[in-house]
């Protein structure tokens, strides 16, 4: 099979790293998958922090954004549009928001897809047993035989997938200013669909993929909790302080 540049740069190095770490150093290829998954998520953590903080700040400044947009509502002349754009830019600057930060998440997608491909292609992984589970077997074939290990595996995948999808909303609700928009409700519906989608594929694909999904889900939950507690909530305080300073300056100016 001919390898493309994507395989050469990402998939093959990740596959070899899993095999080396798991089979050579740890004598367990499944542990190699878990550790490389953790390592990759540590590498992309700074990108995820920047993106999540920026997205949360964007939500927090929505009332001010709407105030500016309403101020220029119906005014289509170039001067008004330029003033509105300048005020929005000033709002971003005041709250230290980069317009490009929310798009940085997309930079991580090739890496995560490469990890997915790497796990699928490591044949030795499907000959491995872990906790009484044959990682090459399809869980669905064993669930209907009431084999507990496979039932537990799919249950853990389902629960971790559900919370991995919900953790952003759960943590956002810690902020008293949080308001769920219609866009967020649509996103929640999509997340519910994705959860069912992943559970279905976890059931019909080799158990090695369930191991990968379970590890990724747990990391996502822990990572999101960490970002919100140590970065987002700090950013929320900065936005509140910036708004307070802005209002104070306006009041002093009007005196």
Show where each model-derived region lies:
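Helix-loop-helix
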Residues: 1-255
């Amino acid at each position: 099979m001919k390898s493309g540049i994507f395989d050469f740069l990402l998939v093959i190095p990740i596959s070899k790293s899993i095999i080396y770490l798991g089979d050579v150093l740890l004598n367990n290829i499944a542990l190699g998958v878990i550790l490389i998954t953790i390592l990759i998520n540590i590498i992309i953590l700074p990108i995820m922090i920047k993106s999540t903080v920026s997205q949360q700040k964007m939500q927090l400044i929505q009332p001010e954004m709407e105030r500016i947009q309403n101020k220029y509502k119906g005014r289509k002349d170039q001067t008004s549009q330029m003033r509105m754009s300048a005020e929005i830019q000033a709002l971003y600057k005041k709250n230290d928001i980069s317009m490009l930060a929310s798009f940085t998440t997309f930079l991580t997608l090739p890496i995560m897809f490469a990890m997915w491909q790497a796990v699928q292609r490591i044949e030795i992984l499907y000959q491995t047993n872990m906790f009484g589970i044959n990682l090459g077997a399809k869980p669905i074939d064993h669930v209907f035989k009431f084999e507990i290990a496979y039932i537990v595996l799919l249950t853990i995948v389902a629960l971790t997938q559900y919370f991995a999808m919900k953790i952003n909303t759960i943590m956002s609700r810690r902020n008293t200013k949080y308001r769920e928009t219609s866009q967020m409700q649509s996103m929640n519906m999509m997340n519910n669909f994705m959860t069912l989608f992943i559970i279905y594929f976890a059931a019909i694909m080799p158990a090695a993929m369930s191991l990968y999904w379970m590890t990724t889900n747990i990391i996502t939950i822990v990572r999101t909790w960490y970002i919100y507690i140590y970065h987002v909530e700090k950013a929320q305080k900065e936005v509140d302080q910036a708004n307070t300073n802005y209002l104070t300056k306006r009041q002093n100016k009007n005196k």
